[in-house]
Amino acid sequence: MNLGRVGEELAVRFLKERGHDILEQNFRFAHGEIDIISFYKGVLIFTEVKTRRSDRYGRPMEAVDSFKRRQIYTTAEYFLSTQSIRYHSTRFDVIEVFIGEQSMIHYIKNAFNGNDLEA
């Protein structure tokens, strides 16, 4: 299993332990992918997972640049268009997973929103 897949599995477990209902994993659309889509306390959450062995080359969150955010946002719009249920509240989160002697998870709620997208 590759590093990214391990990180995603740890992130799913992390979210489930906190009461999230996991709706989708690796939801793909022509313009992108969303690692985890979950529902928690009335909020539909789109989560990007970034996994690293260290922060030697920067924080994993830094890899979620404006291009990646736009891909996630566009894919989320597509996901919402396929649902018969109308979600009134959505959120975009990032989970940083560090794999090493001691694995660590850093959960960033509201990491970005539609207003963060650059043209």
Name each model-derived stretch.
Residues 1-25:
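Acidic-basic catalytic patches of nuclease active cores, encompassing PD-(D/E)XK
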Residues 82-119:
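Domain-level recognition of nuclease-like catalytic cores that cleave nucleotide substrates
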